[in-house]
A protein has these predicted regions:
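Conserved Rossmann-fold SDR core element
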Residues: 29, 93-95, 175-178, 184-196, ...
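Canonical Rossmann dinucleotide-binding motif of NAD(H)/NADP(H)-dependent dehydrogenases/reductases
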Residues: 4-41
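Substrate-binding pocket helix/loop in short-chain dehydrogenase/reductase
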Residues: 108-109, 116-118
Length: 277
């Protein structure tokens, strides 16, 4: 794998991206020369969450990229159509789709409301299907087509079903759809998944998964961003149908010092593994 990938001139369409891992991936790709279009809901600041589409766009442009923030809900079909149309109109095509947007509720069957179940399915699984499907005609015309989904490897350990099957089903659905693209378009479109080895310091981890203590046992989103940039530099002939782990990607690329990615208070020995690993 190349340790310094060039995405120069390529156009990325991403779901989410106003904060966290998605924003970090967008900024990193912008530094590598990519155009970034992203669909997110946060138009005005929310005191509970950092970042808006506008602050994310400013960071992309500060990194040297061109940004197209699209305000909308990934669950809405019109938003998907509008996002694809505006991206193609602005940048001339779509080379890469990054399925980043995700909802999480860690509750089991009998504990989770149908409303929350539908939310996870609609954003995670359906959103991945909808955005990828809508962009597919443009990917097939690209010189470097790639679908990258932030979802885990399919772990047969039944622990994840026992603890929170609804979320597990939605994330594994994202993975299976991506592997489906890889098989259906094996020689034409690269389609891969990427997942962190450890907890990543995001608002979701702090507010839902692990609290402040978990943040002190996490890595920064930049580790996922650097790994994503490397994977996105690969062609279908080099890698497709893979479920990559961030630190494995970096190690294979010759990046051995991962301490640079430690979040405040974290050490190399107290990192907590992410879900599904």
């Amino acid at each position: 794998m190349k340790s310094q990938p060039s995405l120069s001139g390529l156009t990325i369409l991403m779901s989410g991206g106003s904060r966290g891992i998605g924003s970090a991936i967008a900024v990193r790709a912008a530094r590598a020369g990519a155009n970034i279009a992203f669909v997110a809901k946060t138009d005005v600041p929310d005191k509970r969450l950092p970042g808006t589409v506008h602050t994310a766009a400013a960071e992309i442009e500060s990194a040297g990229g061109r940004a197209l923030p699209i305000i909308g809900d990934i669950r809405d079909d019109e938003t998907i159509t509008r996002a694809v149309t505006q991206t193609v109109d602005r940048f001339g095509g779509i080379d890469i789709v990054v399925n980043n947007a995700s909802a999480i509720t860690l509750s089991g069957i009998g504990e989770l409301s149908l409303k929350r179940y539908d939310l996870m399915q609609d954003i995670n699984t359906r959103g991945t299907f909808a955005l990828t499907s809508a962009a597919l005609p443009h990917l097939l015309e690209s010189r470097h087509p790639h679908v990258l989904t932030l979802s885990p490897p399919l772990n047969p350990d039944r622990r994840w079903l026992a603890e929170y099957a609804p979320y597990t089903v939605s994330k594994y659905g994202m993975t299976m759809l991506t592997l489906g693209v890889a098989e259906q378009y094996r020689e034409r479109i690269a389609a891969n998944c990427l997942w962190p080895r450890t907890l990543i310091a995001t608002a979701a981890v702090q507010n839902i998964v692990a609290g402040a203590e978990g943040m002190r046992a996490a890595r920064r989103p930049e580790i996922m961003a650097d790994a994503a940039a490397i994977v996105l530099g690969l062609t279908a002939a080099q890698a497709t149908g893979r479920c990559f782990i961030d630190e494995d990607v970096l190690t294979e690329a010759g990046i051995s010092n991962l301490d640079r990615y430690l979040h405040d208070g974290a050490t190399a020995t107290n990192l907590v593994p992410d879900l599904f690993l």
